[in-house]
Swiss-Prot record:
<keyword id="KW-0238">DNA-binding</keyword>
<dbReference type="InterPro" id="IPR002876">
    <property type="entry name" value="Transcrip_reg_TACO1-like"/>
</dbReference>
<dbReference type="InterPro" id="IPR048300">
    <property type="entry name" value="TACO1_YebC-like_2nd/3rd_dom"/>
</dbReference>
<protein>
    <recommendedName>
        <fullName>Probable transcriptional regulatory protein SAV_6832</fullName>
    </recommendedName>
</protein>
<dbReference type="InterPro" id="IPR026564">
    <property type="entry name" value="Transcrip_reg_TACO1-like_dom3"/>
</dbReference>
<keyword id="KW-0804">Transcription</keyword>
<dbReference type="GO" id="GO:0003677">
    <property type="term" value="F:DNA binding"/>
</dbReference>
<dbReference type="InterPro" id="IPR029072">
    <property type="entry name" value="YebC-like"/>
</dbReference>
<dbReference type="Pfam" id="PF20772">
    <property type="entry name" value="TACO1_YebC_N"/>
</dbReference>
<dbReference type="GO" id="GO:0005829">
    <property type="term" value="C:cytosol"/>
</dbReference>
<dbReference type="Pfam" id="PF01709">
    <property type="entry name" value="Transcrip_reg"/>
</dbReference>
<keyword id="KW-0963">Cytoplasm</keyword>
<dbReference type="GO" id="GO:0006355">
    <property type="term" value="P:regulation of DNA-templated transcription"/>
</dbReference>
<comment type="similarity">
    <text>Belongs to the TACO1 family.</text>
</comment>
<keyword id="KW-0805">Transcription regulation</keyword>
<dbReference type="InterPro" id="IPR017856">
    <property type="entry name" value="Integrase-like_N"/>
</dbReference>
<dbReference type="InterPro" id="IPR049083">
    <property type="entry name" value="TACO1_YebC_N"/>
</dbReference>
Amino acid sequence: MSGHSKWATTKHKKAVIDAKRGKLFAKMIKNIEVAARTGGADPAGNPTLFDAIQKAKKSSVPNKNIDSAVKRGAGLEAGGADYETIMYEGYGPNGVAVLIECLTDNRNRAASDVRVAMTRNGGNMADPGSVSYLFNRKGVVIVPKGELSEDDVLGAVLDAGAEEVNDLGESFEVVSEATDLVAVRTALQDAGIDYDSADANFVPTMQVELDEEGARKIFKLIDALEDSDDVQNVFANFDVSDEVMEKVDA
């Protein structure tokens, strides 16, 4: 989920230990399989596969599951599905724009899951293009803070194409053009700086500020969407203050 970055970071930590762990693993495995199918089984020559594997490893997905996914995707092992990426657009409560990225082998099932989740949680589906223009495709790398300063991170990635470094509290968010994502990730590695994830995300050009009630409603909608096996990512243009987040987390 991407919208409020601090929420996304908190949610990621919880996801590793909560009841959705198996579902999270399955989605990561699906990403690996598709990356291997489209770009080959060698992570060294397939940056998308490399990042998908790294993300899975950091979430403690077993190595044997990762290896099998790579082999299935590359056609070296039977059992791979024919997945396609589908984007759905809509509006959530309080006019929050929502992009839903699905990776599915059943278009009808995915469409039904998304529509049901939206309509049951105060959302509405929208026509293609009516929401996506509010987002730009960007490279986003999350770096655990540790002993690092913002200047440490900025110095490592500035010449690689990074546009900004944002302090998220316990981590830094490095934003770049999607085409510079690999260069930014490589620059961090060369500088000896570890990172939690490197993804091409849809970043909103403007955000809707939400109060506690609004935050709870949009989080409920996003949880319902992410509960579908076909939904890989949900992007939304909302923001909430630290004070509101503390109330929601309580």
